[in-house]
Design a protein with these regions (language model features):
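Short acidic, glycine/tyrosine-flanked loop/strand segments centered on an H-E-D-like triad
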Residues: 144-156
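Transmembrane alpha-helices and immediately adjacent membrane-cytoplasm interface residues
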Residues: 1-11
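Charge-rich cytosolic interhelical loops and cytosolic tails of multi-pass membrane proteins
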Residues: 11-90
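Membrane-proximal, non-transmembrane alpha-helical segments
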Residues: 56-138
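Hydrophobic, lipid-facing residues on alpha-helical transmembrane segments of integral membrane proteins
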Residues: 2-3, 108, 116, 150
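Cytosolic/matrix-facing juxtamembrane and C-terminal tails of multi-pass cellular membrane proteins
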Residues: 137-138, 153-185
Length: 185
């Protein structure tokens, strides 16, 4: 639960930096995640199928109030996808992946510090530390130390803001695609 809270803090900062939720951004004509023709088709579908919805159909129709409708439309699609998890498995999978990377990024520094403590502990337990032996005779003396160093490198290199942002937009895109499959309201 603590890690989820840290992940949600990351999410809030990301939204502030982006200026909106990725689920809102992908419906904007200024965003290229979804091509213009598909986006216009999605806007038309949403306007037809969701009561009282008025998404802009052309680029020139978009204004500062459009985000309110985009967010409302995506909230509807999210509720629909959650209620139909059996048929919307991709959306659910993308959501789980986004949540995983968001939460992992949220606890990144704690994980690195813990891995570093374990690596230092292992280093202290090794008699006559030798870099040559670490590569040539790794097992069993150096295995845990090398493993912790690899974990630290992976956390530093792979777990970053870009992967969280990428997963957020993948989820947003798959959620937007739901509008082609949902039933009339």
């Amino acid at each position: 639960k603590v890690v989820r809270i840290w992940g949600k803090n990351v999410e809030i900062k990301m939204y502030e930096k982006l200026g909106a939720k990725p689920t809102t951004i992908v419906l904007r004509y200024s965003d290229s995640t979804i091509d213009m023709l598909t986006k216009t088709r999605y806007h038309k579908y949403i306007n037809e199928k969701i009561k009282d919805m008025d998404l802009p159909i052309m680029v020139d129709d978009e204004n500062e109030k459009s985000d309110i409708f985009y967010e409302s439309a995506m909230n509807y699609l999210r509720k629909y996808a959650n209620a139909h998890r059996d048929s919307e498995q991709r959306v659910y999978q993308d959501l789980k992946e986004y949540n995983f990377w968001r939460n992992l990024y949220g606890c990144k520094w704690i994980a690195i510090i813990m891995d570093a403590f374990i690596a230092v502990r292992e280093l202290c337990l090794i008699d006559n530390f030798n870099v040559r032996d670490m590569f040539l005779n790794m097992y069993p003396t150096y295995v845990m130390f090398v493993f912790m160093m690899i974990c630290i490198m992976l956390m530093c290199i792979v777990v970053n803001k870009n992967i969280v942002k990428q997963r957020a937009f993948e989820y947003a895109k798959s959620l937007a695609e739901v509008c082609e499959r949902f039933v009339e309201v």
